[in-house]
Amino acid sequence: PLVRQAQGTEFALSDLFLGNMTGSFGETSALLIILGGAYIVWKKSANWHFIASSVISFLVLYAALFYSGIQGAIDPVYALFSGSFLFAAVFMVTDPVSASQTTNLGRWIYGTIFGVMTVLIRVYAGWPEGVTFALLFANMFAQLIDHLIKEQKKKSKEKAAAA
């Protein structure tokens, strides 16, 4: 869908939402991805902070670029429902092994890095996607994010105890 949109032809938004198009297995129906995401959050297999921060940062940055007329930026909702971003935000970013796991702030930062990097790669790089690179980039910083936040909390507690 992203390539077709760049060529000037695109799928209807309803087709993207329902999955009435070609694409990689599992990423074509936004409706099913959202339902699957709701299920894994409800079952507490995934933390909603990852998903929310990824999607919010993705939509905010895409909207800023699209409405400011940046070449290569497409409609944010169309961008959300096309490609593998939504699939990755729900099922890959929430991976308990590689993601920032110990603090809610770390989860928000991790998801935001993923969402922002996906947009920047999609708009400014030569690839129509960018999800894999963005996920790897965010994973590089996951442990550092957790470490820095824990250290900051530790220093705050020590300061409060000393006062």
Model regions: which residues?
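Long hydrophobic alpha-helical segments that form multi-pass transmembrane helix bundles
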Residues: 1-33
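Hydrophobic alpha-helical segments embedded in the membrane of multi-pass proteins
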Residues: 31-34, 52-60, 79-94, 108-116
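Membrane-helix boundary elements
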Residues: 33-75
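Hydrophobic alpha-helical transmembrane segments in multi-pass integral membrane proteins
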Residues: 65-70, 116-129
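Loop-to-transmembrane alpha-helix initiation sites
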Residues: 76-85, 106-108, 125-138
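Cytosolic-side transmembrane-helix boundaries in multi-pass membrane proteins
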Residues: 123-163
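Alpha-helical transmembrane segments
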Residues: 69, 92-103
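Structural signal for the C-terminal ends of transmembrane alpha-helices
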Residues: 41-45, 93-94, 141, 145
